[in-house]
Each structure stands twice: as C-alpha cells, then as structure tokens.
Swiss-Prot record:
<keyword id="KW-0378">Hydrolase</keyword>
<dbReference type="GO" id="GO:0005524">
    <property type="term" value="F:ATP binding"/>
</dbReference>
<dbReference type="GO" id="GO:0005634">
    <property type="term" value="C:nucleus"/>
</dbReference>
<keyword id="KW-0963">Cytoplasm</keyword>
<keyword id="KW-0539">Nucleus</keyword>
<dbReference type="GO" id="GO:0097433">
    <property type="term" value="C:dense body"/>
</dbReference>
<keyword id="KW-0558">Oxidation</keyword>
<dbReference type="InterPro" id="IPR043129">
    <property type="entry name" value="ATPase_NBD"/>
</dbReference>
<dbReference type="Pfam" id="PF00022">
    <property type="entry name" value="Actin"/>
</dbReference>
<protein>
    <recommendedName>
        <fullName>Actin, cytoplasmic 1</fullName>
        <ecNumber>3.6.4.-</ecNumber>
    </recommendedName>
</protein>
<feature type="modified residue" description="Tele-methylhistidine">
    <location>
        <position position="74"/>
    </location>
</feature>
<feature type="modified residue" description="Methionine (R)-sulfoxide">
    <location>
        <position position="48"/>
    </location>
</feature>
<comment type="similarity">
    <text>Belongs to the actin family.</text>
</comment>
<feature type="modified residue" description="Methionine (R)-sulfoxide">
    <location>
        <position position="45"/>
    </location>
</feature>
<dbReference type="GO" id="GO:0005856">
    <property type="term" value="C:cytoskeleton"/>
</dbReference>
<dbReference type="GO" id="GO:0005925">
    <property type="term" value="C:focal adhesion"/>
</dbReference>
<dbReference type="InterPro" id="IPR004000">
    <property type="entry name" value="Actin"/>
</dbReference>
C-alpha cells in the first residue's frame, strides 16, 4: 500500500446488522440490517420499477410485502448469493466506492468453519477485485477499541456469542469459547412468550417488530426470582408498545424473562452454560498467572450486551463464581454496539498492520487458503 491517501474499508458483517465505513473514522458511515428481501406477491403494475430483491433498510421498509432472509446465521454465511448482494449494496449504494480501489478489512467470529473465510476471501478478490483484504477476529477488535491489550472480551451480537481472552495482544485460542445463543434467539424467544400473552407474531416481518420491542423495552434483572415476584404482585414493571397498525400491547415480566435466557439457556431448551459461566470457564482455561488481569478487564461488546442492567448482573454472577478476594471489573463502553467496527478502523490504520494485508498478488499465487496463513 504505497499510496497513503487510499483509505481502507472496514466492514463488520454481523448476523443482524452490517456496519461499514472508512478506516480512521470514529464511527461506521453505514449501518443497515443484514437482510435480503424478496417479494411474496406478483407485481401487477408495470413501470413501478419493482426489483426482484431488496437489501438492508429498503427491505426493512417494504417488509410487509417481502419475505425477509438473513444470509448470516450464527456468524456463518449460509447463503453466499445473498451475501454478495449485501456486499455489493455496501460498496456501491452505502459507501459509494469502487472496491477495486480500496483494501477491505472484514470481520469474523472465532471458531468459524474454515471454508467460511476462504469463500469470503475468494469473493473479495474474484468478484470485487479488491487490491488487498484481511479477516480479523471480532472480539480482538473490540479490545483494540477499548484501548487495552489484555482482557477478556464477551462479545454477543445477533447470531453468536463468544468469549475471547487476550493477553498482551495475543488471543489465547485454546481458551476461546463460543455460544450459539445471541440476539436472534432472544427475539425468537420473545415471540414465543408474547404468544403466551395472546399476541401472535409469526411472519418474518412481524419478527422485526418483536426485535424492536426487545431493543426498546427489555432489560436484565439483577435478581431474577425477586423480579418475577415483583412483576406478579404489581404492575409497576409493565410497559406498553404501539404496533405499526396502532394497536397497543402491554408487556410485563417478558421484559426481563427474554434476556434472562443469556444467563439461563435452559429457557431456550439449550444445554449450554450462560454467558457468565462461559466467561468464567474461558478465564479458567487460561494460565493461572494471567487470570487476575482477565477478571479485572472483562469487556462487553456487541448489540446483545446493550440491555440495561447486564453489566451489574455479570459483575454479580462472576463475583459468585470467582475466588472471593479477586477484583472483578466489567467494562461496558457506551459505544459497544459498534466497538468491533471501531477496533477495525483503528487496526487498519496501524503502520505495523500494513504488511499483514493479503494482496491480490499473494492470492493469485496461493489461492483462498492463504487466509489461514495470514489471518489469525
């Protein structure tokens, strides 16, 4: 990269939202849902300029007549054609750049299938002709954004939650744990428990309404049992929400029962540990000498950590698991929804990072598998 004036593009492809922008910016320029929508009905009016597919916000706004699909599930791309549409939309409509002129930094969840990043690499070089690219681990970027080099990141997005311990800038791969329970599962769970209240949400469009209810009204209880008792005895916790058609629904204990599944996955019929226990287990897999530093630097990142009360609850739960004298500090930066992207924006600018890019030339020589050699 001899030219200094060509900014790298940073794209954080989340399962729920795609965050994209230019390296060096302090926030992503474009944030839109990772959705591709296709019409459910036949177009009858000629000249309307109907398209056979819509991406992002446009799909969201026309959701009443579309079937919405998320091409990324649990952090893994399941539909590459749709994924290509999302990238195309990112480059040409959102950022308005020519991808063949900019290096591109992409992000990925740890412990993803190897084929996933190979295919990402292949599409970037062969379809979009990028001059260089790199795939970074999401949680590592979040730690960069928080200004630390040591800590454990609990990153929970829409599709996947993972805990990554990092010491002096090195991720410790043997201690990384991944939990396929995140925002989308909570949305589905909220759909289910609202049905018990007599509100029916079934279509892909209605799921988006429930996601909005979740984001606006849910919170994490410090003491779940006590909160349930409060909700049963008074209506102080009830909130109302107006649906797009003007109907008003009331939601009570669902407000904290929904995110409680993060701490008790058995609510979803899952046999895994909650996020607090996963974080603790991840720390316990690390060398005994560095645990103290990890407990004192537990960083939350991702949209599913945005619930009010989640940091206090994590503090309480981890304190209960850890040795009694241990100092535990949960760091929840206000911009943590975008901290992966912000970390990518920082990384792509570092002078020491410039030799890490995979160039088009290296790709042509080695093929997609080069990504495993050059990207951690």
């Amino acid at each position: 990269m001899a030219d200094d004036d060509i900014a790298a593009l940073v794209i954080d492809n989340g399962s729920g939202m795609c965050k994209a922008g230019f390296a060096g910016d302090d926030a992503p320029r474009a944030v839109f849902p990772s959705i591709v929508g296709r019409p459910r009905h036949q177009g009858v009016m000629v000249g309307m300029g109907q398209k056979d597919s819509y991406v992002g916000d446009e799909a969201q706004s026309k959701r009443g007549i579309l079937t919405l699909k998320y091409p990324i599930e649990h952090g893994i791309v399941t539909n590459w054609d749709d994924m290509e549409k999302i990238w195309h939309h990112t480059f040409y409509n959102e950022l308005r750049v020519a991808p063949e002129e900019h290096p591109v930094l992409l992000t990925e969840a740890p412990l993803n299938p190897k084929a996933n990043r190979e295919k990402m690499t292949q599409i970037m070089f062969e379809t979009f002709n990028t001059p260089a690219m790199y795939v970074a681990i999401q949680a590592v970027l979040s730690l960069y954004a928080s200004g630390r080099t040591t800590g454990i990141v609990m990153d929970s997005g829409d599709g996947v939650t993972h805990t990554v311990p990092i010491y002096e800038g090195y991720a410790l791969p043997h201690a990384i744990l991944r939990l396929d329970l995140a925002g989308r599962d909570l949305t589905d769970y909220l759909m289910k428990i609202l049905t018990e209240r007599g509100y029916s949400f079934t279509t892909t469009a209605e799921r988006e309404i429930v996601r909005d209810i979740k984001e606006k009204l849910c919170y994490v209880a410090l003491d779940f049992e006590q909160e349930m008792a409060t909700a049963a005895s008074s209506s102080s916790l009830e909130k109302s929400y107006e649906l797009p058609d003007g109907q008003v629904i009331t939601i009570g204990n669902e407000r904290f029962r929904c995110p409680e599944a993060l701490f008790q996955p058995s609510f979803l019929g899952m046999e895994s540990c909650g996020i607090h226990e996963t974080t603790f287990n991840s720390i316990m897999k690390c060398d005994v000498d560095i645990r103290k530093d990890l407990y004192a630097n537990t960083v939350l990142s991702g949209g599913t950590t945005m619930y009010p009360g989640i940091a206090d609850r994590m503090q309480k739960e981890i304190t209960a698991l850890a040795p009694s004298t241990m100092k535990i500090k949960i760091i929840a930066p206000p911009e943590r929804k975008y901290s992966v992207w912000i970390g990518g924006s920082i990384l792509a600018l570092l002078s020491t990072f410039q030799q890490m890019w995979i160039s088009k030339q290296e790709y042509d020589e080695s093929g997609p598998s080069i990504v495993h050699r050059k990207c951690f």
